[in-house]
Amino acid sequence: MFATNPFAALSASIPPAVIQGYVVLMIVLVAAGTLFDIVHKGSARYFFDNWRRSKAKGGKPIGGGELFSIAAQTAVVDVLASGEFCNARRRVAHLLTMYGFVLHALATAVMVFAYPTAATSTPAIWPLLWWLGGLMLLLGGYWFWFFIRVDVAAEGNTPFRVVHADLFVLSLLASVTLGLIWACLQANGSAASGIFCGLYILATTVLFAGVPWSKFAHMFFKPAAAFEKRVSKANGTADNLPTLTRDDPEQQARHSMELLRNAPMDMGLGIKREAPRHY
C-alpha cells in the first residue's frame, strides 16, 4: 500500500488526461484566487506603499549585500523554521503541517504527471513521500485543531466550533484525510473506495477553489511581511514602533525608580509561567 501509486491505479477508471487536467485546474484556481485576494484586500499595494513610506522617512540606506542577507534570514528563520512562533508547540505543529503539505503536494504532482498509469513503474519513494507528507500534515493539523488553537486552549471553546476563518484548515484536513482513506481502501480492493474518491475530489476542490474566502493565500503574504519587517528594522524606521529596549542604557536611565533602572531583563514575565487557561 505504501509503495503503490494510487493515481496510477485510479487511471484504470478515470483517464490520466482527466486527472492531470484536474490538477492543472487546481493550480490555476490557486493562482487566480491569490491574485483576486491581492487585489481585493490591497495586500500588494499596502506592502509597496509601506516600503515607499519607509524610504521617504530617510532611514539608514541598505546596500545590496545587506538586503540579500535580510532576504536569506527571512527565508531561513521566518519561512523554513517558522521563527515567528514563540510557542514551541505551535511552531512544531506548524512545521509538521507545512512540510507535510509540501511533501504530499510534490509527490502528488510527480505521480500524476510522471507516472500516470500502471504501465509506467512508479519508484517506491514517491508513494512513500505521499503517505509520509499526508500523515505529517494530519498530525500537525489535528494537534493544532484540538489542542493548540487559542479559542480552544485559552478561551475554553469547544474544538467543534467552526467559523468562516476555519475554511482553509478544515478543507486541508478533510482533503488529506479522505485522500489517505481512499488510497487505503483502493489498495485493499474495497468497493467503498469510489465513494471516498468522490469525497476526496470534493474536499480538494473546496480547498483550492476557496482561496479567495480562506487563509490559503497567507502562505504567500507572510514571507513578504516578514521581509518588510526586517528591512524596516534594519533601516531604523521600524514601522513607527519604538526601537529602544530595556537593555538599552539610555532607556534604563529614563526611569526615576531605582528598581526599574536595575531590574533584570526577565522582570515582569511571570504571566508566561502558566498557560492562560483560567476561563
Question: Which residues fall in each region the model found?
Answer:
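Detector for conserved single-position "signature" residues within domains
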Residues: 270
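Extracytoplasmic/periplasmic C-terminal soluble domains
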Residues: 182, 263-264
